[in-house]
Amino acid sequence: MSKITVIGAGNVGASCAEYIAMKNFAAEIVLLDIKEGFAEGKAMDLMQTQSLNGFDTKITGTTGDYSKTAGSDVCVITSGIPRKPGMTREELIGINAGIVKTVTANLLEHSPNT
């Protein structure tokens, strides 16, 4: 089995992690977010559904600690900000591109073979 990291523990990231767990695509999932305690809480919520949903995947959450992503076979980036009223798509993609660049640099440092 493998290790999968999901960056961003919002609705998309948490749903992605839940689907990966329910399909038993990985032995371990790391859910990472920048909001303090957010990914840890989502991971605990998902782990509490383990027996109900019939999966054995270990799910852990972390706040910005990319060292916990080390050895990941796959990394899924779902992080970014939503478009705000009055914001152009060009402004949004500029901000989200910066987020993806930072996330990618951190992932490559800890899981260079991802």
List the predicted regions and their residue ranges.
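Glycine-rich Rossmann-fold phosphate-binding loop(s) that bind the pyrophosphate
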Residues: 9-10
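Aromatic pocket-lining residues of Rossmann-like dinucleotide-binding sites
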Residues: 20
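N-terminal Rossmann-fold NAD(P) dinucleotide-binding loop
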Residues: 13-14
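Extreme N-terminal starter segment of soluble prokaryotic enzymes
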Residues: 1-4
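Conserved NAD(P)H cofactor-binding loop of Rossmann-fold oxidoreductase domains
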Residues: 79-81
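Conserved N-terminal Rossmann-fold NAD(P) cofactor-binding segment
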Residues: 34-72
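Rossmann-like NAD(P)(H) cofactor-binding subdomain of soluble oxidoreductases
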Residues: 88-114
